[in-house]
Amino acid sequence: MSFIRARKNGGTNRVTRSTKKIASEIRELTCARVMLAAHEVDEMDSIDYVVRLLAAKDWDHVMVTDDRGSLVGRVHAVDLLKLIMNKRINRDLHWMEVVPISQAVTRPPLQVRANTPLMVAATLMLTHDLNQIAVTNSNGTLVGHVSHAVVARHLPRFLL
């Protein structure tokens, strides 16, 4: 039954209930349920290692963590390329082999907790023009990431 026909027949309660149910389901869909494994490197890994890893794995970003697994920052391949091409960091291979990636991270890293609703993560990504966002547990340890592709995979079922 269409919405217009439901209104004519006095069936607005049925439509309202289903809308409330959908809204509730959207709020209950958390990042923990849909997140992907994080592309992760240690903060002491060299810039050269990270550049090679991004190219070899065909990744567009990596999350940088410390020795406890806590999120330190995020490095996007395009941002790293811009740093190198604009000569903000030395292009010398020897230099890139000894300088840690922590020197090129985006700080502070934007992150959400595992229990954050997916809609909140999607809103943050759109607001801050990010393709992905880190997901951490209550201790701040990196547990995964959510991307536009994840959002596109899970939210359309609520819209149709």
State where each predicted segment sits.
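Tandem CBS (Cystathionine beta-synthase) repeat/Bateman regulatory domains
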Residues: M1-L160
